[in-house]
Amino acid sequence: MEQFPQSSPRGPRRAPDNQAPHERPRADRRTGESRRGPSPHRTPTNKGSHAAKTNTGATRSSATDQQATARPKSRYIPALDGLRTLAVVAVVLYHLNLTWAQGGLLGVTIFFVLSGYLITRLLLNEVAKTGRIDLKSFWIRRIRRLVPAVVTVVFVTCALCTIFNHVMLTKMRPDILPSLLFFNNWWQIAQNVSYFNALGDPSPLTHFWSLAIEEQFYLIWPPLLFAMVSMHVSKPNTRRVVLGLAAVSALAMMVLYNPAADPSRVYYGTDTRVFSLLLGAWMAFIPDRDLAPVRLAHRLGLNRLAGTAKHGKNAEGKSGEKADESAETAPAQPSALVRFWSSPASIDVLGVVGLVGLAAMVALTNGYTAFQYRGGTLLCSILTLMVIAACVQPQGMVARALSAEPLVWVGKRSYSIYLWHYPLLLLMNPVANINDTPWWQYILQVLLVVAVAECSYRFIETPFRKGAFGRTVAEFRDGTTTPANWARAHVPVCAACAVVLVIALGGLIFVPETSALSGEGAEVLNKEAKNTAPADQQAADDTDKDNDGFPDGSYDLLMIGDSVSLRAVDSFDGVFPHSHIDAEKGRQFDAGRATFEGYIQQNLAGKIVVFALGTN
């Protein structure tokens, strides 16, 4: 049974008989050479010394081979950056509200699977090298990788909203702390905020919900894996545990989804989304070479047939004259299925099917469909695994295509693009802008997002990831330099930080709360109310008295809203006689629909019904 590597190396292990000679461990072949005796071309040496050296070398080589087999190799896979590019492009297209990319929100699912896969590869590689997981070091690396860019985006967005859009500043105020502390998703759930239905501009920090789920995974998964390693749980059993947890999470999404309610609880929840990360983690336990076509045939139980076709062996693995004697037991020709799974094309077919499936889901699904929550997100995760399997085979067609330099370039900056695109696109495309945006403006907006992301990647993420902050602090401690001298040497950086902080903090402190109906909309209503004739106002008052309680006959206009609608009650009643506002703080669309059904049952819903929900 395959185990996690322990601190003490084991002795050499002989390759299975059904394994092809070229697949046997190097140490086994060396041991075979030693059994045949020294080469006549070598200088004779002491036999005892030679045997000892041979055995020691075989043991070391076998132990090294075992570790290499037990862990995924720590190597850079450029095709995975190409897959990141496809994911972030899907998300950006979705937030541009393009009708042919309403399923672009599935790009986040692709990110989840990739994150679970790559993080688990790193952890398994560390276990293979050291036999343990340094949790403190892991979390410090995650903080250096993620937090500097997050803090920058939050404060720059505050500054931009202070200058350009006070409604967005009001929306993002309560989201700042949850975003910085990575519990944004649970905050949105607690506030009953819909991801899909919002009146007016949403919070520019809404997209931080996915970062929160990833950080929560990084907080819980490494200790859990370390615990299983410490308890010497075998790799097959660990894989079963991971797959079981993923199944529970996927089932939770299906069970908790209610077609009659807003799906945001299921969409935001860590418990209902973590299966994508866990499926990626599960795949990380499979060595890259086991995803090669011949090894896939082995896992499918086709290895003997594949070996027969390739090496001319019989069903019992014999060759030569014995193979001729047993020819009756060996198949004359391998089946088409065997030939397919043994060919390099098989893994590319999996990858292409995965890519086509993902593209179809982006084009044909959206966040409202029941399919999305009753198997669609799970299917997206499985399709992503198929693409990853093709990406880790560097000679494959899919891997070469996704390793194209432009795709890799964008993929390396996908985290920055994801962070910056949402607030920038919201500021450039506010809800109040009802004019059609020409295609060339969208292109300019995307180019601006990429330019800002490049600056963030080059001047914020990369220096922090490479330890620039730690080195600067060390210089302060050693007395090599002082904060004042450092500031004089980095005047542009300090000036930019100071300007952003002053504007952002000034906006948070001094700009009053502003809502979609408390600004220009409220001014229009108040102006109209003042211009209303006294006779009309008296008629409205008389009508309101008749409407107290639930009057006979329906309202001419019924408005069902949340707390923002309450602010317009006085002006609304003056402008629209025989009308009624039913407003409640924190009300969302599912509750608004139930309220509306109540008015229908009492014959009070008139010809015009206004829903003003999702603003808070």
Task: Show which residues each predicted segment covers.
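N-terminal acidic, proline/glycine-rich, low-complexity intrinsically disordered segments
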Residues: 1-19, 23
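N-terminal secretory targeting modules
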Residues: 3, 28, 32, 467-558
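Hydrophobic membrane-embedded alpha-helices
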Residues: 3-5, 14, 67-82, 86-509
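Residue-identity detector for glycine
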Residues: 11, 32, 37, 48, ...
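Short, Lys/Arg-rich, polar N-terminal cytosolic tail immediately upstream
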Residues: 24-31, 35-76, 333-337
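A generic local structural motif
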Residues: 74, 543-546, 594-598
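Conserved SGNH/GDSL esterase-like catalytic core that processes O-acyl groups on lipids
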Residues: 550-616
